[in-house]
């Protein structure tokens, strides 16, 4: 009984850890895309002058 509970808790913790890592990756990629778009806009503006 106790062993089953320990296994369940460890599996749940692993799933939560993986999900949080995936969310962090998605947010990091989104931030990078926004920065890249901003840099491209700045470069285009500089080319216009």
UniProtKB/Swiss-Prot annotation:
May play a role in cell adhesion and is important for virus virulence in vivo, although it is not required for the virus life cycle in cell cultures. It is a single-pass type II membrane protein. Induction: Expressed in the late phase of the viral replicative cycle. Keywords: Host membrane, Late protein, Membrane, Signal-anchor, Transmembrane, Transmembrane helix, Virion. Residues 23-49 are intravirion. It comes from the Viruses. Residues 1 are virion surface. This is Protein OPG059. Belongs to the orthopoxvirus OPG058 family. It is found in: Virion membrane; Host membrane. The chain crosses the membrane at residues 2-22. GO terms for cellular component: host cell membrane; membrane; virion membrane.
């Amino acid at each position: 009984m106790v062993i089953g509970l320990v296994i369940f808790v460890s599996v749940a913790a692993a799933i939560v850890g993986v999900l949080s890592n995936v969310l962090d990756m998605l947010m990091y990629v989104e931030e990078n895309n926004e920065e890249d778009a901003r840099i491209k806009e700045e470069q285009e503006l500089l080319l216009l002058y």
